From Swiss-Prot:
Membrane topology annotation: Single-pass membrane protein
UniProt KW keywords: ATP synthesis, Cell inner membrane, Cell membrane, CF(0), Hydrogen ion transport, Ion transport, Membrane, Transmembrane, Transmembrane helix, Transport
Main location: membrane
Matches recorded under Pfam families: ATP-synt_B
Annotated GO MF terms: proton-transporting ATP synthase activity, rotational mechanism; proton-transporting ATPase activity, rotational mechanism
Self-association state and partner proteins as the record states: F-type ATPases have 2 components, F(1) - the catalytic core - and F(0) - the membrane proton channel. F(1) has five subunits: alpha(3), beta(3), gamma(1), delta(1), epsilon(1). F(0) has three main subunits: a(1), b(2) and c(10-14). The alpha and beta chains form an alternating ring which encloses part of the gamma chain. F(1) is attached to F(0) by a central stalk formed by the gamma and epsilon chains, while a peripheral stalk is formed by the delta and b chains.
Any GO CC annotation of this UniProt entry: proton-transporting ATP synthase complex
NCBIfam families for this protein: PRK09173.1
Designated name of the protein: ATP synthase subunit b 2
Function: F(1)F(0) ATP synthase produces ATP from ADP in the presence of a proton or sodium gradient. F-type ATPases consist of two structural domains, F(1) containing the extramembraneous catalytic core and F(0) containing the membrane proton channel, linked together by a central stalk and a peripheral stalk. During catalysis, ATP synthesis in the catalytic domain of F(1) is coupled via a rotary mechanism of the central stalk subunits to proton translocation. Component of the F(0) channel, it forms part of the peripheral stalk, linking F(1) to F(0).
Family per similarity comment: Belongs to the ATPase B chain family.
Organism: Brucella abortus (strain 2308)
Transmembrane segments: 1-21
Length: 159
């Protein structure tokens, strides 16, 4: 019986004690628990990944919706700006047309006033000339009557 034999016997006794103490079962249970824990962690990771993908898809959808809404807002603002520009242009054209019409009316009134003033001056001049010609050719009594008659005729034609 040499040392190898006694080492073998010690090994067999050690293995018997380990089996008697149910160490392989404890190791198996520990490994099974660890495997179950890893499976749960993997399942949680898979669930979290799916949720993250869903959130990412939702954020992409919301971003596209926000971009579309922003585009709609910009298009609406452009339409409103164009409408306001057209309205301002139309209002300006109407204002200019009204001002032109008013200026034309003032010019026409001024022309009429000028023509009336020239006519009045011409009448006054004609009356004065007629008066001086008649004064030279007619005596004083006839002069007064003739002048008054002519003045009455001119006044009746002007009114």
């Amino acid at each position: 019986m040499d040392a190898t034999f006694w080492a073998f016997i010690a090994l067999v006794i050690f293995v018997a004690i380990v089996v008697y103490m149910k160490v392989p079962g404890m190791i198996g249970r520990t490994l099974d628990e660890r495997a179950d824990r890893i499976k749960k962690e993997l399942e949680e990771a898979r669930t979290l990944r799916e949720e993250a993908q869903q959130l990412l898809a939702e954020y992409h959808r919301k971003r596209k919706e926000a971009e579309k809404e922003a585009g709609d807002i910009v298009a609406s603002a452009e339409r409103e700006a164009k409408a306001l520009l057209e309205e301002a242009k139309r209002a300006t054209e109407e204002y200019v047309a009204r001002r032109n019409k008013l200026a034309e009316q003032k010019i026409a009134t001024a022309e009429t006033d000028a023509i009336n003033a020239v006519r009045a001056s011409a009448v006054d001049l004609a009356v004065a000339a007629a008066g001086s010609i008649l004064a030279e050719k007619v005596d004083a009594k006839a002069d007064g009557n003739l002048f008054n008659d002519a003045l009455a005729q001119v006044k009746s034609h002007l009114n």
